[in-house]
Regions:
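Glycine-rich phosphate/diphosphate-binding loops and the adjacent beta-loop-alpha structural elements
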Residues: 36-57
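Feature captures C-terminal
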Residues: 1-9, 58, 62-246
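Alpha-helix capping and helix-loop boundary segments enriched in small/acidic/polar residues
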Residues: 12, 16, 52-55, 220
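Binuclear metal-dependent phosphoesterase catalytic core
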Residues: 1-42, 159-166
């Protein structure tokens, strides 16, 4: 049984470049250029992350979470939650990696945002499971970054009140609600359930979201989160306003 450990090394370490290997890479880059440079929409606003802090909701996070909820609203989904760490790039008007016009969004730019191949998962959570998931997500904003800041949640369809007891998040109230003023309806409580959509990394307990592994009526959609975002960009055609803040 191997008892060693991984060792970081310089990526070239003085090794000469092999022309035959470089040719394979160059061919692959050329073959995928058509897909990467395909324009899927336009934006007159920047969709940016809260980067590098990842301690609060972001315009890009709201866009992705809203797209998730909208995609599955017709099958009973009430809320969406994804993790900040899954968002790997911004969508900026000034970015033109494929030579496209400023403001145009390419498939490659969308892929840079969500490159991990995660799929969406729908499940029903109890109130207690939802609260536990949110408490895990709000650990970084409360100062507990021991597990990294990527767990900070980006969500849609929820209005959440919480406070920090030292470094421990305490969820005070959760509503099913659209962004805007504090809801005046009663918040969720014991006995309530919520149908949510998340990603398969979080569903498997990634970023500490073990509470999401215990949902019921689970539906593995098979839809890539990347495709859900692209579908929303194509549906809008042009993004002219930022998503409302929850």
């Amino acid at each position: 049984e191997w008892a060693g450990a991984a060792t970081r090394v310089a990526k070239n370490l003085g090794v000469a470049q092999r022309p035959d290997v470089k040719a394979i890479v160059d061919d692959a880059v050329a073959e995928t250029a058509v897909l990467r440079n395909r324009v899927i929409g336009r934006a007159t606003v920047d969709l940016a992350r809260d980067n590098p802090d990842r301690l609060r909701e972001s315009d890009l996070g709201n866009f992705v979470a809203d797209a998730m909820r909208r995609k599955y609203a017709g099958v009973g989904v009430q809320a969406a939650i994804t993790n900040s760490g899954g968002l790997r790039a911004d969508i900026l008007q000034s970015s033109t990696p494929g030579g496209e016009a400023p403001g145009e969004i390419t498939w490659g730019e969308a892929f840079a945002v969500l490159p991990f191949g995660n799929a969406t998962v729908i499940e029903t959570l109890t109130y207690e499971q939802l609260v536990a998931a949110l408490a895990n997500g709000f650990r970084p904003p409360c100062g507990d970054v021991s597990g990294g800041t990527g767990r900070t949640p980006q969500y849609s369809g929820l209005w959440v009140e919480f406070h920090c007891d030292g470094n421990v998040p305490v969820i005070d109230n959760v509503w099913l609600a659209e962004p805007g003023p504090k809801p005046t309806t009663p918040p969720l409580g014991p006995g309530d359930t919520v149908r949510i959509v998340t990603n398969d990394f979080m569903f498997a307990g990634g970023d500490g979201y073990t509470a999401l592994s215990g949902g019921t009526n689970v539906l593995q959609t098979g839809d890539l989160l990347l495709d859900v975002m692209i579908e929303e960009i194509e549906r809008l055609g042009e993004i002219t306003t930022l998503p409302p803040r929850d």
